[in-house]
Amino acid sequence: MSQVPVASPASWSSVASAAAAAVSAATSASSSLAASVDEPAATTATAATASYADERNPLIALFDGLLRVVLASLNLIRILATFSTITVPSLVYAILHYSLTLQLNFPSLALLFLTSLISAFIWLRYRHLNKYERLREVPITRDEGFNLNPDVASPGGDNDRGSFHNYLDDFLQAIRIFGFLEKPVFHELARHLQTRRLVAGDSLSLDTDFSFYIVIDGHVQVYAPLPSATASAVGQDSVEDEDDSGYQLLNEVESGGTLSSLFTILSLFTEDVKLSFDDHDDPHLAPPHPAYPAMDRLNNSSAANHLGRGNNATAPTSPYSSAFNPPSQTAAQLQLNAAALRNVPAAISTEGAVERLGGSAAVRSTSKSSHARTASSGTASATVQDGDTSTIMDPLEQNDDGVTSSLYHAPDLQMPPAQAAAPFSHFAPSYHPSPAGTPISSLPGSTHSPYFRGRATSIHALHEAAGGPNTPGSILSAMSSSAHGHYHPQADYLPRQGAGTVARATVDTTLAVIPAEAFKRLTKKFPNAAAHIVQVILARLSRVTFHTAHKYLGLTKEVMRTEKSINDLACFPLPSEFYEKGGMDKLRHRFLPQPNSKRETTVDDDYFRDFQEWTSISQRSSTPVPGSKDDTKDAATSSPPKVRIASDLPSLTTSSKQSNQKPTSSRISAARTPWGHPDPPLKTPTARNMVGPGDLLSMASLSQDGWYTTGFDMHSAQPTPRAKPRSVSKLEPFHGPLPHPVDDSTDGTSPLSGASPIPIRKGSSTMYHQGEAIGTDRPFANIGLPHFDIKNEVMDCIAKSIGLAQAAHSPLAPSYQASPHINAQDSLLQRSVFKSAFGSLSMLDAAMAEEESSITGTNSSMAGHGHSGFHPSDFENEVEIKFFPAGSTLVKAGESRAGLFYVIDGFLDVLLPAEANELEEEDRLKPNMNHKSAKTDASSGSSRQNRPGSHRKDSSSASLRAGLLDERNLREADVSLPQRRGTEADRISSNGDGNSGSVHRPAMREGSSSSTSYGTPAGLRKKPTESAKVGNALDGTGGAGSSSRRKPSHVSSGSGATTMPRHPDATNSNMAFTAKQPVLHPSLHQQQPLRGKPSQQSSQRSKDGKRSIFTVGRGGIAGYLSSLLGTASYVDITAKTDVYVGFLPAHALERIMERRPIVLLTLCKRLLSLLPPLILHIDSSLDWQQVNAGQVIYREDDPSDSFFIVINGRLRAITEKTNGIEVHNEYGQGDSVGELDVITNSRRRTTLHAIRDSELAKMPSTLFNAISVRHPAITIQISRIIARRVRTELVRSKQEGAALGAPIPGLPDLGRNNLNLKTVAIVPVTRQVPVIDFAAKLQTAFDDTIGGRAIFLDQSSVMGVLGRHAFSRMGKLKLAGWLADLEQKYRLVVYVVDTPVSSAWSQTSIRQADCVLMVGFGDEPAMGEYERLLMSVKTTARKELVLLHPERSVPPGSTREWLKNRPWVHAHHHVEMPGLTGSHAGAAISTGGDPKAVKALRNLKQKLETSLQRYRKTMTPLSASGRPHHASDFARLARRLCGMSIGLVLGGGGARGCAHLGVIRALEERGIPIDMVGGTSIGSLVGGLYAREAEMVSTFGRAKRFAGRMASLWRFASDLTYPVVSYTTGHEFNRGVFKAIQETHIEDMWIPFFCNTTNITWSRMEVHTSGYAWRYIRGSMTLAGLIPPLVDEGNMLVDGGYVDNLPVTVMLAMGARSVFAVDVGSIDDTSPRAYGDTLSGWWVLLNRWNPWSDASKIPSIPDIQGRLTYVSSVKTLEEAKKVKGCFYMRMPVEEFGTLAFGRFDMIYEKGYKAAVELLDGWDAEGKLPSGTEREDFEDDWEDGDEYEEYEVYTDDESGVGGGVRKIRKKRRRTRRKAGISARRNSI
């Protein structure tokens, strides 16, 4: 075991000594900095000793180390104590005792101070004063390429066919032409669907049957025969492929197209409809047998064809009458004749066509016997008397070959053709042939019974006696069905080109066929559906064919010839006894002025006061009243019942003996009158001095129902069914005594009984006094007509003329449910049944009730089954008897809803407007031409004017006016009252009495408890025209009557009248025979026209270029086509002589047509038979296309095979580029597209797509070529259209080429394409937006500013009209048709989206809109739910943003937040809406979020405004609080939507621009609103200041402060720099602009603003509409050399005046209609210079001091450079002066320098005075736009009329602001009242 050794004491001592040595060594080492190198041995020894000691004892080493550490610490403490107590105090002491001496002189101190000041200035300059440099936001760009690209909106939306396409799709597409079809109806057609295969080259005669052909697969060409005259020419020198075929290519039909003309379908539906109805259709009166059978006439030799022409004694046969040459033609031959007529080329006269039909001696013989003609060898004209024809052809009219046709030549104008119905039997024709020149009446068998009304021998009675012409059928079928073998082959009479249209398949083609039997079965099984199809076809005819022929092809004359033929066919004058017994004289006496007007009226007053006295005087010179004992006995013994049903009364109640008695004056030779009227010489009434106004108020039946007295409740809105009348119809002839049906249901007094006077109606006034009781109820009793009611007689004649009186097939079993049932809800529409393709689809609502479905309604008059006679008990007689002096204009071309004018006596001229006028008007009105059809019947039922009383001394110049307006008419008329200016007839014959005053008289009788008190308009009082002063040439009177015009309340124009406000208690009351008159202010009658008289101007225009198409005489009807088709009038209708007419308003005619489709069927029958072949060919080739929103119609570089006419909807033409798309133009209603490409045979230049669902008329180029061959005049018409289109594009390209070359997308079309907007949708951003209140204020603005020609629709209004199923799948087609109808009636249709996002109305509104207005709060830029809906719909319509603000201020940059997230917004508008609570700003104001101090200031402001308001009333014409209506933001928006904005463009000129402030002040004082502002240079600054808040005070202050800064020489000097780029740095200039504009963005400005600059980097002009305003205003003011160019995104911008100093074209491109352009530029010295070929500068310098030298005129280098820079600007300035709508204002401030800002006040005052003078001058001329003028001034009136608006006003109580302003103010007030009424009845 090992043991541990223990150290001895000696060893411990050694260890300790070693440790001590180690510590001492360590201490010495720490004290010394380094060991000595000389002692290595000692160190080694010490270390060895230490290690030895450590090795010896570790404890000793430890203690030794500790000891050394303690010692080292003590040493350190000693050192620190020494440093702190000795070293530091010594150092401090040394520093404190140190001294330094610095010596500086004053220059050194000044330099030091300046250095410090400059350093501080630089620090502030670049740190704080250049804050504007950091405002560099990039302008907002709009991604229009994405937004407007149709491929994005509707991929595959064009006609590309998918792989799953089949023939059923084509079939469904083709039958859309029939409108909406219910499922059983569709199945009925589909059940008969067949297919037919055509091999390439096969031909198909489209006239062989009436089947409906649809091309399913393949390609078919349609040909029409060439005219014989042109066929040879084409054969000799042909440009077509079909050189010698004799046919012309009309159309090329591809898959999905139709081959058949819709007229073939119409012919099936009208087989049993007669062309006209006469008394001889009744079985009681069998017509005489014809002299020749029809077949025998067709079998005669062709040599007799020229018999008519060879006969010098008779004029040629009327073509239309010859075409239907009964009396006993067979149906087959009638079909042949009609079909051949339809296929006769237009180049051949219609007479020649008849010759080709079958020219036999019998034809001519019968023709001669059927048409009495008078001849005169000494004259070049002949009177054409086709029995009862009511037309006189123009003697100078030529046929299509250019050769004057003998058809249009007649002898001297001796009498109207309708005088066959006059009481002169020697003018009456007969059935029997007579020798030439022999009076027909002298022949045996001629009928003279007055009951026959002279119509017994009319040509239409001839062929109607045989049942009327049947449907135009197939030529082949007619040949096969000819009876008795008397028919010669048609080839003997018709060349090959007359066979009709032929279809030829170019490739193997498959056709889908709906056979004719299917439509026949449809007619019998579903008559209501068939009626609907007829309506749709008529709609297509009117809206496509007639529209194209009239508006585009210039074939108005051809269309109106059809109306002339209809007048020839259906002429029904009044009974002859009315004329021969003095009825006409009594009627004329009715319009004489009242001689005893001072007498107070009583309840016994009647129209025929002192009638016996007049009768005694009249009978002295008139024929004694014919009568007999039977007459007396009949009148004395007959006791009519207490209630007389009108249908039970014959038209003329005379005995049979009386009927057979010839008038004693019938043998007297006709007396010549100046206008050819053969009036009997003994029937001239007493002479009169004037013709006064008035109305034939109540000639007989003054009952509450208008026609008869029953228990009908006038409070009912719709007529109730009457009791079933007797089988003896009113139109049925009567032999024997007058029947008196017994009616015990009432104890009232019949108006015909004469037992008691008519009760007085409250609220009405009369113009006549009642006479004795004997004449009260029988106005014609004293002249032998005791039961004659002229209103009923006129209505009977109108009913027969329009086909309403179709006789029943069986007189023993008349049907009384002859038309589809129309419920009350459908009748509320009060609209035409044919205006739209889907109009009056009553079966849609009825489909919800089985008993009203078109499937179950089997009794329909349209099918020809159960035709009942005309029963007036079914309708309310609304005929108005009116008088028009010679020269009056009843209807002007372009007017809608004119109504029917039945001529009682006199002549009406149907005039074709002058071609030059049309072209000029089209050029002038092209942007706004599609609203002309927006007219209503507001004035057609207007109140009639009373006969002038004794209160006016100038009654000699009383107007000859008469009109009616009852409350029911008001209720219907108010639907569209604001948008209609009324027909010419209404302006002449209604509401006004020339210069005469008016007096209220007691009512005639008591009506319903709430009779209307509607006052008639107080119109302009004009001097009588020359024609009116002549008086009635018929009776020799010299009554002076004014033919002044009148416009309804919303139109203030030439002779317009301002309608008085409706009485609040006015309700339903039939005022058919009540006259009304307003109380007019005396000052009205003292107003003198500013320009010429409209009637004289109209007469002058008529002399200048209007051509007469035909004349309408007695028994004729004017306005037939336009009224029944619901289109605007194609012609002017004027009074050729003093004329008395029966006027049937449009709304009354609409109700008749809704209940009796037979009227439309009769029209269809007549159109089938009488339309010229040219029109039929056009109709067969025109394609009616319905395209969906976004659908591409054609693309760029496609072949040009057709062009399009927009019927409804909107199209956009674009071209695609690398950086997006370029919008070229937008086309609205009435515009044509693509004809330039077709005519030039070039490829499409643009891509055309539909913005929304649209209707188009497509005209193929082949049709155009064919028409050009047949009608060369069309080529000229199209050439003019092309030339105008090219000229317009060239002018626009010149104007916009330099001005609109801006890189900002969307600026060129920012407002150019809003001029013809038709539909606008108001869509809220979120549901919290008060869109209803917004729409109400906007509608008020429309009414107050532009006349309210807009209708606002919301869901409730639409459902109220169309029912709760309006938005269902079934009702969509009906809704589309109704909306399209509204577009034609109104200038603007506004859809208000007031429903949830998911509703159908929201989507419908967006899809139907041309422009979408997104309405949101200005301080809430978040995306709303409706915006997401808008994006999902993918509409390509323009989208504009409306930001609502509670006050007129916009926080800077807030608008940018809206726009940067919505690149699809095209424009934005700031609108002030006081009381707005939905936004954050409005909530902050209303909830008290402001501090107490702000609240106190607001309260003080309100108190001050309230206290100052009483003083302001005497200073301003505005009585309402807030801004003027015309200056409000809503009015600005309304003008924007209608394209009537007023712009202000301010030019550049340095300090001379201070005159701009004076111009703005003058405009504000005159009340002219400023809707947009633009400027250049100093004009951009002044314009920007005004646009910021639209307030003059702040603008003036800020502009004056800027001028003060610029006038400071110190500031200018402080900004000088070394002139490398410019003389100044531009900082002071920038600072001055920024201080004036602040941080406002251009998009934040309240009024739309722009400024232009010149980009010298790219050498172009730029227009700025977004970004910081100060930057671009400064850039626009950058004068090169004085200020450095502004750098914007790398481009250098200088003064915009270098390119365009007055950017008028930019303002027009933004949508302004009128522009005030203010020029303050300097005028350069243009005097000649002469200084030789060389020039020494030294010589110039020396001679500048020589006063006799011309050296001062030598320009310097800066002058030469300045003139060079403004070369382009001078050219654009001259062009701007010539721009239409530009009011150029040159300010006389040339003497002031460019930098003369110190003369601010002088320049300002000079500009103000100059502006006032200019405005006064324009105001005196009537050219000054005010923002409140009616839009249809320019659209519908001539230059002489538009300025007379200033004379239309009512009394003004304020008495301030006289002259024009006073009148305007009152005009606005009156218009507002009318607008309120219209808004109340907007639907």
From Swiss-Prot:
According to its UniProt record, where is this protein located? Endoplasmic reticulum membrane
Q: Name one GO biological process term.
A: phosphatidylcholine metabolic process
Query: What ranges does the record give for the region Disordered, renumbered to this chain?
Result: 284-327, 355-410, 618-693, 716-764, 921-1069, 1084-1108, 1852-1883
* Record-annotated membrane-spanning stretches: 76-96, 104-124
Q: What is its EC number?
A: 3.1.1.5
Residues the entry annotates as binding a nucleoside 3',5'-cyclic phosphate 2: 1166-1285
* GO terms for cellular component: endoplasmic reticulum; endoplasmic reticulum membrane
Name of the protein: Lysophospholipase NTE1
Q: Which organism is it from?
A: Mycosarcoma maydis
> What is this protein's gene name?
NTE1
